[in-house]
Each structure stands twice: as structure tokens, then as C-alpha cells.
Design a protein with these regions (language model features):
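Sec-dependent bacterial lipoprotein signal peptides
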Residues: 2-23
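Long, terminal "pre-/pro-" and other extracytoplasmic accessory regions
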Residues: 25-213
Length: 213
């Protein structure tokens, strides 16, 4: 009795297996269904410290003794800058051991003028020590972010901002003999040479320092 049933079951097994295969192939796959697409957010501007930290990490792989010399922003047409945040930033790092300097950029998107998304390292240049006014500074001295510097500068510039609401703003961070700590320079205008108004803010304390007209 058991052998007869077993034979009949084994005889029909290939047909049952084929039926299951064809059935599974004919049914639409659940994973193949169209999934709702997550909307892609447009690139947003970032603060100076956000960009600086990412450039610093890569600069350390170039030279463990790197020190920042300068941090500056530049505005992108496709990413609106706002309240101390910009679409792209540039930093210059120096290595006393290598006697070299190297420029890095960080951008939230690809842009004209050889601006690449993410961190991009430039070529090495010779550096034998401070030239001009700017000096390397310690990373720990950068405690105040660019948006905080803008807020401090804006408090001292309400009248100017009302009259020049649409004027571009960019940022420069450096250490010079003018002040004991690194200072943010919040600059209204397209370039330093053409600007008629800028405000210095201490990058370590957030204190207002000076207004240049």
C-alpha cells in the first residue's frame, strides 16, 4: 500500500514541480513593482566649519602636521548663499615639515571654474614660512562658525544691510597681526578690492572686532 502511494506520488512530482515553477514565473514579482521615488533635494549651502572639517581630514592624509592658513568662501550661481552659508569653500593648508602649501576646495555641487563636488585637492606649492600678513593658526582656535560670524556682523550692520539687501556676501578667515586670534571677515561685495564694507569677528570668541568702510 505504501509503495503504491509512494510510486504514484513520485510519478506526479515532476509535473507538480513544473507547475509550481511556471506559476511562480507568471506571477508578477513583488520586488519588481515600482517603488515610490524619494525626491532629490537641491544642493544646500553649508557653513565654513562644515566645509573646513572635511577639507582638513583630507589634508591630514597629505601631511599630518598641516596647519590652516586661510579659509574663504565663494558663491555659486546654482546654490544661493544665505546667512553665513555658501555653496563652496576654499582652504589653504601649510606643512612646515614638507615646506609646502596646498589648496583644497569643498563644494556641494559641480560648478563652472573647475569647482568639483565634495573635497578636491589642488597642487602642492613651495612654502618657506609666512609671507605678508597672514600666519598659520591652530585648528583649536576656530570655535566660531561662519553663520555665527554673520549674525554678529549683521547686528552691527543693520542700516547697511537695509540699503544693500541684495548685495553678495562672502567670508575670509585668517590670522594676521591686526588681531590676536583668527578672525572672520564678513565682506559685502564681489571682491575685497571692490567692497566698501566689511566686518571683523573674532573666530575664537565670536566678539565683534572692527568695521571697515
Amino acid at each position: 500500500m505504501w509503495s503504491s502511494i509512494g510510486f504514484q506520488s513520485s510519478a506526479h512530482f515532476p509535473f507538480i514541480l513544473l507547475s509550481l515553477i511556471f506559476t511562480s514565473c507568471s506571477e508578477p514579482s513583488q520586488t519588481g513593482k515600482d517603488q515610490p521615488k524619494v525626491p532629490t533635494l537641491p544642493p544646500a549651502p553649508v557653513t565654513g566649519r562644515f566645509a573646513f572639517q572635511r577639507m582638513y581630514i583630507q589634508a591630514r592624509t597629505w601631511a599630518p602636521d598641516v596647519q590652516p592658513l586661510r579659509l574663504s568662501s565663494f558663491n555659486l550661481k546654482q546654490v544661493a548663499s544665505a546667512a553665513g552659508k555658501c555653496g563652496a569653500w576654499q582652504a589653504i593648508f601649510v606643512s612646515p615639515q614638507k615646506s609646502k602649501a596646498r589648496t583644497y576646495t569643498f563644494s556641494v555641487t559641480e560648478s563652472a571654474g573647475d569647482v568639483h563636488e565634495g573635497v578636491f585637492a589642488g597642487r602642492e606649492e613651495s612654502w618657506s614660512g609666512p609671507r605678508g600678513q597672514e600666519r598659520p593658526f591652530f585648528l583649536q582656535a576656530l570655535k566660531v562658525d561662519s553663520d555665527e560670524a554673520f549674525a554678529a556682523a549683521a547686528q552691527k550692520s543693520s542700516d547697511y544691510i537695509k540699503k544693500n539687501a541684495d548685495m553678495a556676501v562672502f567670508f575670509l578667515l585668517e590670522l594676521t597681526p591686526r588681531f590676536p586670534n583668527p578672525a572672520w571677515r564678513v565682506i559685502w561685495g564681489e571682491t575685497i578690492a571692490t567692497s566698501n564694507y566689511s566686518v571683523f569677528v573674532d573666530a575664537s570668541t565670536g566678539q565683534y572686532l572692527q568695521t571697515l568702510r
